[in-house]
């Protein structure tokens, strides 16, 4: 299909066919259709979460060693990229930390311990379906009873992975609203929301869903809140590491100077989120937040990545008009066939275009936080590798069983 697209659209022969094939795959595969969307935050919390099983998951709630018990934080979306770092930071700061997960057995399996062990040490893991409002409230009431009604904060790191309308409103709006309403039901004091910088210019479904929840959070009066809108995560701008290590070019859009960003590390962002529980200057505020770097273009990011791997830069410039051709084509098919799958594919194309043309950048010194630079991150992952996430970028490469065994052995 990618070869046909190349010839029919008269695309340059040098354009990576994987780029075209991935976009076309959006319309045909439930899994690959999500692979194009850049990660915006939080972890996978599907709208088809497992049913909640109330088998006294709180038996060891007061047995964690990660806090004095005087301060309590409940983390939703705990297994996500930012969520797991937030759990660790909450424990580090002395909170009795409750990590809400959809599948406790999976988290506590051997594989789960490899993924989450260092992040969840000292935290209490509680299985819960955040999409089930009644069960979520029941869960938080049980937690509250175990800590004498002393829940300082509910921290939501929830985010849909795909960004399509159905998922966005199920997670970015409704599941997050469930967390708010459950927090209000148990008189939790503060709500910290991991939102997204890009909602400032909302022309995507997930942005509108996030804004709808932000409005609900601001309208209620029972809990104080802090809305944190990070620019971009390090993971979101690291997806081409493996392909350039293998000799493929770094792909960018336009001339590589179209957009600028100052991404923030997961550890720095987690620190900011947990600090927001007790920092009264952030009460009832919306905070745009970026990392310590100066504005970085996509070309500059590529140069930094090549520096980290010790190779000469090799760039491929993808034309921005390609997005319009693909989006318009998919939308035409969606409208003609009344196809939800093609509608979702068109939305994913719009998400890709958004991040190719919009700055994710804070310039006010008060909106910069953290110590880790993107170059330091690139230098680190060039040596140690990075956790595979197919949702980060179309260029991510799935690990083989052999490579995973080698990583564990190392």
Task: Outline where the language-model segments fall.
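A general structural signal for well-ordered alpha-helical segments in protein cores
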Residues: 151, 176, 240, 298, ...
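NAD(P)-cofactor binding segment of oxidoreductase domains
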Residues: 142-157, 161-191, 208-215
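A hydrophobic C-terminal alpha-helical subdomain
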Residues: 54-56, 321-410
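Short, amphipathic alpha-helical "lid/cap" segments that border enzyme active or binding sites
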Residues: 137, 177-180, 266-274, 371-379
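Cofactor-binding loops of NAD(P)H-dependent oxidoreductases
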Residues: 128
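Residues lining the SAM
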Residues: 76, 157, 194
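Oxidoreductase cofactor-interface core, primarily capturing Rossmann-like NAD(P)-dependent enzymes
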Residues: 52-118, 131-134, 141, 149, ...
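N-terminal chloroplast transit peptides
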Residues: 1-45, 51
